[in-house]
Amino acid sequence: VSDRRWRDGAEDRITAVLRDAADRSSASDELAAHIDDWPTRYHFGRARTNLLHPLRLGTGVRILDVGAGSGVNSRWAAEQGASVVAVEGDALRAEAAALRCEDLDVEVRHGSATDVVDDNGFDLVLCIGVLEYAGNEPDRFLAHLAGLVRPGGALVVAIENRFGLAYWLQADEDHLGLPFVGLEGYPPVAATGATATVRTFSRPELAGHLTAAGLTAQRWYQPFPDYKLPTTVLTDRCYDQPDAVDLVDQLVGPPIDRSRMGGRVSADERAIHRQVVGAGHGADMANSFLVVAATDDTALDRRSDGDALAWRFTGDRRRAHLRVRRLTDDGVRRIDRRATHPVDTATGDGRWLVLRSPGGATDDYTPGPNLEQVALDRIRAGDLTGVRVVLAAWSAVADRGAVHRTVSDAEAHPFLSAGSRTVLPGDHLDLGLDNLVGPVDRPDELRFVDDEWEATGGVDRHLVAVRTCWKLAAALVAGGTRHPWPPSTTVDRLADKLCA
């Protein structure tokens, strides 16, 4: 696993950016400003470290990061107080990792993971995006890594699922760049010399390899759209919930990132995912896996979070606005909202937009489909009258809080134009269909959830309506939802039709 098959060609640029950067932290706005293609997104995107939230890290935890790349995960683990040994087989990436982590307790080694020997052992051994390069000896490789885990510790593996939903929907296999080749068993004719031994695994296959390494206690997580830049991480328990179809759909949304997964995906992926979950195959057909494996359940509980149902993360915002929602259910389902990285509590643009509860908050989860899900179902059915009913329900909720007055020039902001005459409360900036839950035919019973932002002085009703329709149109396109308009209709044109 010490060759250089995973280079993306951007290593020199990544190293140069890191060398000049004043802020090399895992959530650095400075580094994120350099994102302009897939390699820079991979190395500098803040979503990379979302994958590690199910792990119990902190002061005194010793970590081995195998195939550390440019040091993204090593950096984040060390920021949590862990002591990290980062091993990277490529010299250029090892140099980048050393720069990324130079001010923290991280020892970067250039070499092969199979050469690592450590008498003290590690509490966690991270094998993220590496096992697929173990060639024809995955059992031997995993056994070596398992031997580096100290008593009470765990091995953490992240890898694509060979039978993941994305691959069935014709997304390109991540390493060979061709559709279906993993499902076909990696035929040699499809590979190059550099990819001839690349292999990913189904859930039963991977579970078997971990068991063969003596790691019989396993806790499985499902990152979406995959483990590289996850916006959601689910647990097996999430799929066992009575409302799993709606719950998983709410948490995941479109299960495939069409902007970077390649291939020719043309199906309604969100509808298919709902069917897969409803049939009981959701966990086995996740696009990728995060597995925490140990010799006993006590070690699993010590090193990973077994209480959560799921984690959902905000998009790649500025550091001050990055949030995680941790969903739990101990008899009452709750959502705990927290910053993913330490920030000042004063967040917003300093003038008109404020992030509510910046220090975090816990709310009860409101069960049931949200109005976006209802609207998508009615659009799939070609029921435009039903879509109008959904939008009318939204309108009724908006009108409850409306105030009729004339907005002055002094109080105007991007979502409150001077001269506006119908003003909604400031938190109604977030009044999208995805944030309304309850019976569509009884608008008075609809509950407004996840009202994260607040605009000073209120927001213009018309602009919020346009934003609501645009978000629904974006959801239609992102998930490939079948609709009665021409397939080439853009998000903006769909939003126009919905607003009308």
Would you name each region that the model predicts?
Residues A196-W220:
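Short alpha-helix
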Residues F415-H483:
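Catalytic activation segment of kinase domains across protein kinase-like and atypical kinase folds
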Residues V157-P179:
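Conserved class I S-adenosyl-L-methionine
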Residues V1-D23:
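N-terminal auxiliary segments of SAM/dcSAM-dependent transferases
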Residues D139-A154:
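A short glycine-rich, Lys/Arg-flanked "PGG" loop and its adjoining helix->strand segment in the class I
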Residues S70-G81:
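Conserved SAM-binding loop of SAM-dependent methyltransferases across substrates and taxa
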